[in-house]
A protein has these predicted regions:
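A short glycine-rich, aromatic-capped structural motif
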Residues: 35-95, 113-116, 138, 193-194
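Functional-site microenvironments in short loops/helix caps that host divalent-cation chemistry
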Residues: 44, 50, 54-55, 93-245
Length: 267
């Protein structure tokens, strides 16, 4: 079958149903009563949201609707100070770059942690890493925005919104985890674009969106090679930190631009 014949109607239908969802369907995700979240976390209500990007990279397609159960997620990336408490309590090895004075400030995100390190911390806290769907919903809210604050950006606002490469955002490397409040997501999360890439729970599959479940998708069930990373970092351009961008690496890899935040599922 001709590829254009298949993809053009699909794009039209994606846009059509997105419009219906936004304009006509109820939005239980914002109307539910909100339980009190644990300190430093934000409640994300259950409900549908549009995931992916119909005009983006191949692994971001198609735009599709996903339903997640309610959960709590960290308002900001795990900081060096928070990770130090984990090290002191468990004897876990210190991260790579722990002695780097440009990266180890207490209120900056911990970096140099592998996916396995991040999972160990999350389990110690009683939670886990977010799935891709949970992460994107927390960053995007209930519409098809490309950044936490919307679909547009102005060259003059980097100082207040996001930590990316080559812009006047006030930091050469990582920024404090509670910085850039103007760039918060619709739910109030900070640094969902830029600062550091964030490990997610899922194995990576470039074609997963084409076959994924509508309800609480969690990546391929079988072990893969790479784990998902989301959000971009201070070494990416503004396009590279869109909330739909997907990256990946092997779960043992540690990098100065890799950090994480945690999720606590609802009982």
């Amino acid at each position: 079958m001709n590829e254009n014949f298949r993809t053009k109607p699909a794009k039209f239908l994606s846009c059509f149903f997105l419009t219906l969802l936004i304009l006509y369907l109820p939005a239980p995700t914002f109307s539910q009563s909100k339980p009190t979240p644990p300190t430093g976390m934000i409640f994300i209500p259950e409900g549908y949201f549009p995931m992916g990007n119909s005009s983006g990279r191949e692994d971001e397609k198609p735009l599709h609707f996903v339903y997640t159960r309610a959960f709590f997620i960290d308002k900001h990336e795990v900081s060096n100070a928070e990770y130090m408490k984990f090290i002191e309590a468990t004897g876990h090895a210190k991260p790579t770059f722990w002695e780097d004075e440009t990266l180890n400030l207490p209120n900056h995100p911990v970096v140099g942690v592998s996916w396995r390190d991040a999972m160990a911390y999350a389990k110690w806290k009683g939670g886990r890493l977010p799935t891709e769907a949970e992460w994107e919903k927390s960053a995007r809210g209930n519409d098809d925005r490309l950044w936490p604050w919307g679909r547009k950006f102005d060259k003059g606002f980097f100082f207040y919104y996001v930590n990316v490469f080559g812009e006047d955002d006030n930091y050469k490397k990582t920024a404090p985890v509670n910085y850039y409040e103007s760039g918060a997501s619709p739910f109030g999360l900070l640094n969902m674009s830029g600062n550091v890439w964030e490990w997610c729970l899922d194995w990576y599959d470039k074609d997963f969106y084409r076959i994924s479940s509508e309800l609480n998708p969690q990546g391929p069930l079988s072990n893969g090679i790479y784990k998902v990373l989301r959000g971009g970092s201070y070494l990416n351009s503004i396009d590279g930190v869109q909330v739909v961008r997907r990256s990946r690496n092997r779960p043992h890899i540690k990098n100065e631009i890799y950090g994480f935040r945690t999720v606590l599922p609802m009982p």
